[in-house]
Amino acid sequence: MKNKSDLSIVNLSTYTSPVVKEVRGKNFIEYGEDNNYFQYLIDRYNGSPTNNAIINGVSEMIYGKGLDATNSNKKPNEYAQMKALFNNDCVRKLCYDLKLMGQCAVQVIYSKNRAKIVQLEHMPIETLRAEKCNEKGEIEGYYYFSDWSKYKRGNELKRIPAFGTSKEGLEILYIKPYRAGFKYYSPVDYQGGTQYAELEEEISNFHLNNILNGLAPSMLINFNNGTPDPEQREMIERRIYEKFSGSS
């Protein structure tokens, strides 16, 4: 006789850190599954109120009162030039990206004769991917695409040389803290908390869906061959909980 309560148990997938990989035929380095890890971080920022508040607060603390110098009185001309290059809005955005994304990028714009730097602008970090490093292990450029989630092989990419590697009028200064084992990108310092941010988001969605469904049950189990005895019902209920109530 076939066991009516024969159920299979499925373990849910576990959390993994972002994958950084070189793909044959591509000059840039992918970051995360589907090359879209920066968007994953943005989604966790938008979906978790706790994560959102922490990132906003810490980025404001990094910014503080803006960019300053301890020797501004001794070098007033250099200080004035620095303040002219780094406007407050640019610095604030860099601090925000540094906390949210773990890194940030600056567009370095030179004069026509390339005698000096005339402007520094924030570059949204999620629009950049690192070029494969040279034989010396140096990254010589970055590739720009407005939305990497829509990138397809054959789409035109804009290559921007890394700061100090070319004679072009525009370069990218890529700022990232050192992380052991990561050459191209730096994981965020809250890497271990991203799954909790996602968990908070999913719990919110779960309760919202319950409200939108009028608090109706989300699962109904029907036994076509009669009602099992209490012991069998308890075993079936326990197995259903094991299968659907979260990762182990």
Show the residue positions of the predicted features:
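Structured, contiguous alpha/beta core segments that scaffold functional sites
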Residues: 1-248
